[in-house]
């Protein structure tokens, strides 16, 4: 056996070379620039061994093939030329793999992403396991980049241009059966026989060429291709609002390769990669990636977590059902649900059943796996089965006496070490724990709806919460697949506190006569996934406005909303999407395609509905209030760092990730510019825009959130 640092070559007795990939000291395999020499040394041995029948690339890691290229390599590039050179080096290495004179098979188990999939594409055939951990994709667009090692050229030729565009423009990841159907892999097998199946495929002298589906063959022709790219460009521009330059370059590069040939395509790919790597959008998106990775590693406190073997949930409603699903089906923990009636329990069970059944229908999991996961969830109308639960999450109504009663009942019916975690969105955790016998084991755990989709949770200790309770709760959130940030027990916590003035200002502009669709379109153009008015409809107008009095009582008039407007809307039985009417009207089952602004909303609030502000002015008014409040949260140590503030806003409310989060965005604008803009808006619209003390101080000292050592205040 010849051994290198991350690649091991073993020639079997049947003359098939097996190259095992195992980056030392790392949980996952990533491709690094220094590995090129190691791979080339192995390729040289393979070329020189004339007796070889084939080659298999396989990972020695337990649950991943190659998770991608090491993104740090891009950060070391000083200019576009250096990044372009990096791409060309990757392209050359993949070309050398593809040029091997014997069949080359990629045997894939676990994540095969980015540079990992580009390497698999350079192999002659691909075979993967049917494991749920196996996913294949090119997610570079999510970092403001495009695949730089040949992915934009090989993938369209393998699966067809339409499928390739969809994969590369969205960064979507395909599971094993999806990859097989798309033609991305040639076979799907159990993990136990992956190597032998790959070896047998490598021994075949002739590997049959795959024929593209008729639709893809039509789209590959000049006329079909022209129509496809015209439609894709239009659809992509509508979706990105011009905020993500990588998508435009991806389309251009793929089209170049198909129209002018692979050589021109590879050249265009490398140049585009180099240029995109230097864009502020890519730098911001990579910063979000690194920050989220750090947050996921953060234990929350210095204390070791307590036991976490099973969880209880109080309330089987929308939130309770979602929390049960992420706990059992993502976290793998047994869950016991308590509700006052069996209907609530049945609702929670159906919630998980529906999500799992969808996965079965899409062939993401087998029916047996669905049943296995569902078996982790049980329910009761009393506290039977709760005595041994390590942590209990309450998801009942936002009523302080009720939540205090839940604390007392859990302390009476559960173990002495059981943690009580409240999913409150507005009530102080200290008040919920006020009468607790063990207040050190009471904490907030604020999920966002829909629970199965929203990645963020806020972990909220109160003054007496123990360090171990924090660590255990953070550990649970991570097991649930969430990204947790620890925030202070102050009104609104962090996410709702910065969101409220943003939505309030949108409502205020409505009362000034601005049109609903104009306000929403302005913020979508700025980079939010939906506008503030639509967001209020989605959350529920009754639910979304409930926190406003709490915030106004805590922080004063800057949180006041036009109360008469909110009351008029609620009195007209407008709750948003959930009852089919809010600021928008919704068609049958609330389908988005049927959504349209209800003209009656203007009469209801007593305005004509004629927009006078530009889109930039609308966005500025909403966003500046959000940024100012985020800076206050930093100053008051509501968040522990600018890192947590950026991740909380991006993952919790969809703050434009290409701006890096509110704190990176404020740094980009500069504190002096922030203060000047807020002062200008305060002169126009009132003292709610007055710049906070934190920003004024930073402007005077010319400081930044991310560069002055203030990014980790809590530790």
Swiss-Prot record:
Residues 306-715 are annotated as: 3-hydroxyacyl-CoA dehydrogenase. The record marks 118, 140 as: Important for catalytic activity. One of its GO terms (molecular function) is 3-hydroxybutyryl-CoA epimerase activity. The keyword Transcription regulation does not apply. It catalyses: a (3S)-3-hydroxyacyl-CoA = a (2E)-enoyl-CoA + H2O; a 4-saturated-(3S)-3-hydroxyacyl-CoA = a (3E)-enoyl-CoA + H2O; a (3S)-3-hydroxyacyl-CoA + NAD(+) = a 3-oxoacyl-CoA + NADH + H(+); (3S)-3-hydroxybutanoyl-CoA = (3R)-3-hydroxybutanoyl-CoA. It is found in: Cytoplasm. Pathway: Lipid metabolism; fatty acid beta-oxidation. One of its GO terms (biological process) is fatty acid beta-oxidation. Keywords: Cytoplasm, Fatty acid metabolism, Isomerase, Lipid degradation, Lipid metabolism, Lyase, Multifunctional enzyme, NAD, Oxidoreductase. InterPro entries: 3-OHacyl-CoA_DH_CS, 3-OHacyl-CoA_DH_NAD-bd, 3HC_DH_C, 6-PGluconate_DH-like_C_sf, ClpP/crotonase-like_dom_sf, Enoyl-CoA_hydra/iso, FA_oxidation_alpha_subunit, FadJ. NCBIfam families: FadJ, PRK11154.1. This is Fatty acid oxidation complex subunit alpha.
